[in-house]
Amino acid sequence: MFDCSRHFPAFNSAKTFLQVLLGFIRDCSHPSSDIQLDHNEPLYIVELGAGSGKFSYFMIKALEEMTAVFDFPMRKIVFVMTDFTENNFNFWRDHPSLKKYFDSGQLDAGIFDAVEDTSITLWKSGKTLKAGSCKNPICIVANYLFDTLYHDIFQVDGGLLKEGLISVGSKNAEEPDPLDPEIIQRMDNRFRYNTISPASYYTDEEGDEEHFKRILLWYKDYFKNTSTGASLLLPVGAMRALRRLGALSNNKALVISGDKGNNHPEQFSGLMDPHIALHGSFSLMVNYHAIGAWFTSKGGFALHNPQEEASLKVSCFVLDSSLSTPGDTDWLGSSLSEKDTARSAKYPHLCRAFADYVDSFGPNDFFVLQKSIKEDTPNPPLRTVVALLKLGDWDPDVFFKFRDCILNHAPTCDQKLRNDLCRGIPRVWDNYYMMDMEKDIAFEIGRFYYGIRDYANALYYYTVSSDTVGMHHVTFHNQGLCHYSLGQLDIALALFKKALALNAEYEKARSWIEKVERETHSLPGLGSKVACLSLLDSDDATQFLNLSEIPHDVI
């Protein structure tokens, strides 16, 4: 259902975005702020293109945990999930992790097509957010969305501004089925470039004509004397969507966005056709610099992460119409960055949060770190993995990636490190947002507790696994091992038989049935109360632990 080709460290990013949002609210709460908050009115946080809802869940969960430090009544904050498909909406509506937030009114949802919609009708409250209806600034979160919206192609060549036009065909001479989705893998794109005038290119942009013209003139001026020229995309789809959303709150808005893209003009040097990435659909690099220029032209400002080597760029934008300067004609060269610097000085908490949580060590850095530990270190130390888990606040995806290291080393690590794991592992499950059946997090947590001989907790999570993912013969088998270790032979035998009933070829269950039956018959009268005589301390301990297997052959 969902595009899983993008890598976004969700929980780490959600907390980062929330810290930036908190900084913005603190600045708006100051008596001297140009944007005054009304504590009697809702403050809407809207995620565009929420997809599976996983990021929304992490954000509202983190928001709930920060209630004590938020400078705004938590009961008046409403997180709104949006997407353009009914399927995604239905998935959120029925998701058990979101239910309590929907029931409380803290979470709402609505269909919103970023290409054309001008309002959002909320499912739970029945309210419609439309132009001028939001008294407080609207806070917008957009991850991996802008790269899929409309872009215009431009080049600066020999001091001339040119528009790029694309003709799309197939590499095959004929396509029997023009609706075949695999055609996207055979796209044959041809580009041509025609000289244009920036002043007259955009003529119907609902009041944004002057702002778009300023952006084009800025790029033409910046690259006019370069021998290499420049190639750039103007994310008009993103800017049009943000224009319509900004209108909901009378042009008072905060936008936080993460995507693959560029935020410095030097990254556009050279004449080349735009790169089109294919991943089930297709997408383009987001020109965050241009989006920032649009905000600045409208009276706002932009904060960009200056890190150049990053697959995920995060930028923050503020729209504050009170900062606009009517009659200002200075929009070339360094004037944009100078305006950003002057205007952002009125938002010190926002700037500090962005510097601390994005610039210093942001979502991309976390992704790079965990990827390097996973791929470049064949056998990472357990202490390193625990430190990474703590840095990501026990993100279930990180736990799943490093489950083998945890399961292999937890039974033999020192007690202090094991205690650290035991304090954090419950949060892994607390943070879990189920999307599919491929990652059985509860089962893996059960394996962890089984490995450290905490059979009661192991049984609990094995039961959760059966309830959430479904019955599996290995889960029943492992439950049987737990009960055997607790001396509950009758229950263990029943579970081994359940495992064999689900998979008649599962020889390990058959062997354990024979073993338990022999022991039961040799100890008459003790039944289920027979004690397990320190089995894991015997020479068979390693073999015994190895019987706790990964279900469905997932590695």
Task: Give the positions of each predicted feature.
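A mobile, often basic/glycine-rich helix-loop segment
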Residues: A142, D147-E206, I276-G280
